[in-house]
Amino acid sequence: MQCQKCENIAVYTRKYSGESLCSECFSNSILRKAAKTISKYKMIKNDELVVVGVSGGKDSLVLLSILKKMSETHNFKIIAVTIDEGIPGYRDEALGIVKSFCSKLDVEFRTYSYKELYDVTLSESLELREDEKTTSCSICGIFRRRALDHAAKELGANVIATGHNLDDSLQTFLINTLSGDSNKIGWMSPGSDSKQIRKIKPLAEIYESEIVFYAFTNDLPFQTEPCPHMNEGIRTEIREFLNSLENQHSGIKNNMYRSIIKISEVMKDVSFKEKRICSNCGNQCTGKICAVCNMI
């Protein structure tokens, strides 16, 4: 089969569009998609410093690679930041991969750990939880977001970029819907209009399967060992359900994503909560005490 953009042999076919592409044209299409998302939501401005959250997985390393290429032709800088949760036998491999890749790209690299920020590792925090229904992913997510905020403030960054893809958004929407947490539905936009540090998701309109193929076709290293806590919640089941739907009805993920963004915009004002200052640590929150302090 021939690439529809050039005369080379096609190696990838997008079922939802019927488009067959060679390796180079496929990679260029991913770069264009990310650039279009960044432009559409005005994610990065001139002279800004972007902290790129890099876990060592495929999404974050693809994001780092793309933003590095863009920073060479656009006026912004990037710093890679990895958060060490303190999961025995898991995080060490990722740290090695990220450090080596950042050295290859000539990107500044920093690490921050839960232990140094909160005086507990993720494993230790799980022993402190009052309710077993509170999953490790919930705790880790709260800690990770605060850690990235801390890193961005310390480094003087304007923006935090994470590697969340289209599939992640669909899964999160369904998790919040099924758990009755409608307040979080209003914050699904991949961009941010915050006057403080902005949170952006440049890969938010790209399928997870395409990010995997981009990583392989560009020989990007990434950690394949899954987090030992990944199956505690229902995300894995939802991922499999959505993949099954996509296999039977090509393009259904794209349709659902567009609907979610529209719903999120409608829900944004309804979900709005005035920001307060945590009486314990001084960070912004929506209650008297922030989620991090409530946990530790």
Language-model segments: residues:
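Flexible helical/loop "lid" subdomain adjacent to adenine-nucleotide binding pockets
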Residues: 39, 49, 167-171, 175-204, ...
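ATP-dependent adenylation/nucleotidyltransferase module used to activate substrates
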Residues: 2-175, 179-186, 204-218, 290
